Regions:
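Divalent metal-coordination and catalytic microenvironments
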Residues: 15, 30, 41-42, 89, ...
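Short, glycine/acidic-enriched loop or turn micro-motifs at the edges of active sites
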Residues: 18, 45, 108, 156, ...
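Conserved beta-sheet core of the metallophosphoesterase superfamily
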Residues: 135-211
Length: 213
């Protein structure tokens, strides 16, 4: 078991929405839980784009906007959103950078020398570089100068045919520290596979919870 406790921090690399029958409920849980830090995924960004268009069309009827947002979700989701949750979702960053690692949805852009481009230098008008790119997940992509990059976006099964976290170790490293890895592909495709994965940065071990069929 993952055994997440009050003393832990949980990092979620996006794609909270559109990944199951109760994604609105999941969004509210994560946005309002202590010790949880999330970044935007492409699905959240698409939802926010829809939300912003609704706000432009109905600037004086905010209740109507909230009601209209329900149409985004499955009719059986049964968990209408509130303004506090929407404000927190809108404030999510495109990436989180810590001392030893970076959390981002799809990966970091690379220059022609395979060196990572600092995420803060990505133009604000081009979030797709951090949200949509599918090249960073390729095993042959080895960033040369980066902290460990934790990312998701595409289920690992499309790389390895397995529903498990892929941690790419630096040459000659033991694997006991997060510094020993240059990237960690986290997406176990829980909606497709029923396998929820979590990588613990303290001991660099992956843990899984599997849905009972």
């Amino acid at each position: 078991k993952i055994k997440f406790s009050a003393g832990d921090t949980l990092y979620v690399c996006g794609d909270i929405l559109d990944k199951g029958e109760q994604s609105a409920r999941l969004l509210k849980l994560l946005m309002n839980s202590d010790g949880v830090r999330c970044v935007l995924g492409n699905h959240e960004y698409a939802f926010l784009t829809y939300y912003w268009s609704m706000m432009r069309r109905s600037p004086k009827n905010f209740d109507e906007v909230l009601e209209s947002l329900r149409s985004w979700f499955a009719p059986y989701d049964g968990s209408p959103l509130d303004w506090d949750t929407m404000d927190k979702l809108e404030a999510l960053p495109l990436y989180i950078e810590e001392e030893q690692f970076v959390c981002v949805h799809a990966g970091l852009p690379l220059d022609e020398d395979m060196r990572t481009v600092a995420p803060q230098s990505v133009m604000p008008g081009m979030p797709g570089m951090l949200l949509e790119d599918r090249s960073f997940m390729r095993p042959q992509v080895v960033p040369l100068n980066s902290k460990c990059v934790c990312f998701g976006h595409t289920p690992v099964r499309y790389v390895s045919d397995r529903d498990e976290i892929l941690a790419y170790r630096r040459l000659g490293r033991s694997g006991g520290s997060i510094d020993d890895y240059y990237k960690i592909h986290l997406d176990t495709g829980v909606y497709l596979s029923g396998v929820l994965g979590c990588f613990c940065i303290d001991d660099c071990r992956a843990r899984y919870v599997k849905r009972r069929i």
